[in-house]
Regions:
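Short glycine-rich, Thr/Ser-proximal phosphate-binding strand/loop in the N-terminal lobe
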Residues: 2-52, 154-162
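Active-site flanking residues adjacent to catalytic metal/cofactor-binding acidic residues
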Residues: 9, 101, 137
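Short, acidic Gly/Pro/Ser/Thr-rich loop/turn segments
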Residues: 16, 68-70, 140-144
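A glycine- and small-aliphatic-rich helix-loop capping segment at beta-alpha/alpha-beta transitions
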Residues: 23-25, 78-82, 113-121, 148-156
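Adenine-nucleotide phosphate-binding core of ATP-dependent small-molecule kinases
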Residues: 31-35, 56, 181-185
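Glycine-rich phosphate-binding loop signature in dinucleotide/nucleotide-binding domains
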Residues: 53-57, 126-129
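Short beta-strand-loop/turn "lid" adjacent to the catalytic site in phosphate-handling enzymes
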Residues: 54-99, 104-117, 134
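Glycine/GP-enriched mid-protein hinge/lid loop-to-helix segment characteristic of carbohydrate kinases
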Residues: 123-133, 140-185
Length: 185
């Protein structure tokens, strides 16, 4: 299946970053950051990106989004956008659309880093084939990881900013109770 040209996206609660890749060996081009608040939905942001850069329709797209992906329907946690992955694929006339959690995408890229690009935290010597954690702040708190599995790694998805907290005292319990009333945690 031909997957080029393709659109690549990193969608957060505040910004949507898009890039174009014309072929497998081509560098990323037309890199642009759009404010999510300026568009009704992800389809409108993508169409504005394509039109604004004079690009034709992509054949495929890969999007990392700051949200759990548990099925076809995506309802963003930190923004008002919601969409069906299948309907977005049809609307954009894509042969293939892959939507995954943004930090899962970052975790899957970790094996591509060179030794010089990595920083070890703690310990004396790196442990080969050990689990790897990834943590980063954006509009929310992204977390992910990689778990070794034979010759491969398996990504572990998570939403660090949406975890249930354990209270250590009455004051913390009261704060968590208020948060729970508003957000359901």
């Amino acid at each position: 299946m031909n997957l080029f040209p393709r659109l690549l996206g990193d969608v957060g609660g505040s910004n949507a970053r898009f890039a174009w890749q014309a072929s497998a060996s081509a560098p990323l081009s037309h890199i642009q950051v759009l404010s999510c608040s300026q568009y009704l939905g992800i389809a409108e942001a993508i169409e504005a990106y394509l039109t604004g850069n004079g690009l034709t329709s992509p054949v495929a797209a890969g999007i990392g989004i700051a949200n759990p992906i548990t099925g076809d329907q995506v309802v963003m946690t930190n923004h008002h956008w919601s969409f069906s992955i299948e309907q977005l694929q049809q609307q954009l006339s894509l042969n293939r659309l892959q939507v995954i959690n943004d930090f899962t995408a970052l975790a899957l890229a970790l094996p591509c880093l060179t030794t010089e690009q990595k920083v070890q935290i703690g310990g004396k010597e790196p442990i080969q084939n050990a689990p790897v954690a990834l943590l980063g702040a954006g509009t929310g708190l992204g977390v992910s990881g990689l778990m070794p599995s034979g010759q491969h790694v398996l990504p572990i998805s998570g939403e660090g900013g949406h975890v249930t907290l354990a209270a250590q005292n009455a004051k913390e319990f009261a704060v968590i109770e208020l948060i729970g009333q508003k957000y359901g945690h």
